[in-house]
Amino acid sequence: MKLEKTERHGTVREGYQILLRADAELLLPEDKPLMRAFYERMGETCMTWAQAIHGETLRKEFLSLDGIREKSQFGTQRYDFRMRCVWEEDAFAAILCESELLGQWREPQKSYHRISHVWNTEEELVLPFPQILDRFGVRLPKNRLPFRPDGIYPDGDQMVFFRNVTEHTPFLEKKLPRNVNKNNPK
């Protein structure tokens, strides 16, 4: 699958002060119009959220500060959205999207989220979890994972299972071996 790099940049300001820098880097498939449109829309939605919604929250926080000194010490936050193809084999490809919001110098990272899709590139369809597990030879006995995954994708001879950050849990990731030959499980 041939990929084309697309970048988007945005800034949220209040007067002279830069409150947020938002960047998106997308490696979009050139020859797959449905996949391309899907990820273009996702990138646009994430950039809109960063600039309009989170930017407005930062603007209110900045304007509520008293005095020039506190406003001058208000650090710039950074939002990064990256989309790339992490794995490709035959008629299948795994696309990984990572969204990271970096706080000010006092709070190094505010949030990190990951979304993955495994596509049948010939039909341009996203595979559901059970079909991904079956197709890539992963057998999950009960309680093998210490968490319920938000996403899965193949990475070489392993399957990566992950769960995004919530209020009470950190980002979790576990890699399990992938059975290439389904008749001979490892």
Regions found by a protein language model. Name each.
Residues 1-186:
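Compositionally biased intrinsically disordered regions enriched in Thr/Gly
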